[in-house]
């Protein structure tokens, strides 16, 4: 074979290999940029924030998934299965309106969790055939000229998903981060609502995300007693 031809072929092959190498570098670089990077975090800060958030979640778990806000059987303010909320209870947790409830919720849970709560609990759920679930709580506006102040009303037929008492050990341990989520481990004590003598201890792994004004829970914190549970 002609030496000049061989040289040309060698140059072409070398050029192709160089191009392939450059392409590989570019692809590898883009892939690396697309990879999820585990965020850095201050362990003590996350653990301290978790303790506060868990106490808030204890109240919200009761309101959203537990027995709910107590109500009074005032027939003058009743509407179907809705009755006015107990003002004494609301005052004890610093809530007067649904907006107050949302404020506490948004100080506790991530945007994603808040969105799900609002869609499934604070809003009625509809299908093509009509309503399939009524909002658990509604804000009632009585008007400026009415002697009765605005109030929250409670849907009295809402299902109670979690009745057991849940307590969180303040000794929280930050474990790791996965992407933007930081995971912590907390020891949870669950006391059966049917028999206070029955107690279960579990390790619950909870995710947190950092938003503009602080940390938020990004996973549920409720728990249920199981008779046959073994730790």
Regions found by a protein language model. Name each.
Residues 32-231:
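Mature, Sec-exported extracytoplasmic domains of Gram-positive
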């Amino acid at each position: 074979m002609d030496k000049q031809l061989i040289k040309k072929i060698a140059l072409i092959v070398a050029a192709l290999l160089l191009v392939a190498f450059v392409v590989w570098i570019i692809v590898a670089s883009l892939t690396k940029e697309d990879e999820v990077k585990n965020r850095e975090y201050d362990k003590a800060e996350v653990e301290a924030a978790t303790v506060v958030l868990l106490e808030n979640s204890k109240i919200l778990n009761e309101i959203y998934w537990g027995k709910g806000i107590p109500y009074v059987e005032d027939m003058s303010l009743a509407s179907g299965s809705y009755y006015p909320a107990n003002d004494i209870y609301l005052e004890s947790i610093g809530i007067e309106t649904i907006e107050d409830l949302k404020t506490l919720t948004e100080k506790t849970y991530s945007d994603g969790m808040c969105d799900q709560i609002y869609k499934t609990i604070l809003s009625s759920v509809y299908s093509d055939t009509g309503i399939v679930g009524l909002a658990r709580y509604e804000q009632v506006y009585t008007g400026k000229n009415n002697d009765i102040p605005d109030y929250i009303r409670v849907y009295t037929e809402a299902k109670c998903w979690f009745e057991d008492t849940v307590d969180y050990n303040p000794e929280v341990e930050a474990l790791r981060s996965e992407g933007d989520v930081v995971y912590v481990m907390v020891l949870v004590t669950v006391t059966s609502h049917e028999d206070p003598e029955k107690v279960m201890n579990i390790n619950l792994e909870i995710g947190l995300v950092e938003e503009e004004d602080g940390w938020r829970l990004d996973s549920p914190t409720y728990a249920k007693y199981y008779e046959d549970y073994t730790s």
